[in-house]
Amino acid sequence: MKKKEYHRFLGKYDGYKYGWFCAAREFLLILLIVIIIFNVFVGVSRVDGSSMEPTLQHGEIVFFNRMGADYQKGDIVFARMPSGEYYVKRIIAVEGDEVDLVDGMLYINGVAETGAYMQGTTLPQEGIVAYPYTVEEGMYFVVGDNREVSMDSRSFGALVESSIKGKLLLFQ
């Protein structure tokens, strides 16, 4: 009579007696890896509102890199605003840059900001920002692409780097 062989790798004896256990164990391992990736390295959010149109539409799902990044002008970031809410915005100025708002146009270091992503007229907002505004060390000036409806650094000033939770990787 043939002795039943235990399959160390499959976690079962000849046949399917322990096959369900092996499948469940593999599923849980994969689930654990996915949870770790999405809690440590990558974040997921949904765009709420029209402040980033035409680049991002209301309801779009975005993925962002949670690991510290070297944020640059033009980067789209996921950040916590002073109100405590989380929003997706674009960095238009970094530390040392001077932001000015003249006749509906934003100027960064004396150069008019232009880009295919911009929509609407840039108007000043009620808040603490007086122009020209110099971005302090470790801070970022963020705005929405749809300037007419966006609540952004024009009203609350530049964001400290620690309030930026990540740079967008993908959006659909």
Give the predicted meaning of each segment.
Residues 108-110:
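Short strand-turn-strand beta-turns centered on an Asx-Gly dipeptide
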Residues 57, 72, 94, 135-136, ...:
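Residue-level recognition of short, solvent-exposed, well-ordered loop/turn junctions
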Residues 1-86, 154, 158-172:
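Protein maturation boundaries and topogenic segments
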Residues 90-100:
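RNA pseudouridine synthases
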Residues 128-172:
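Soluble extracytoplasmic domains of inner/organellar membrane proteins
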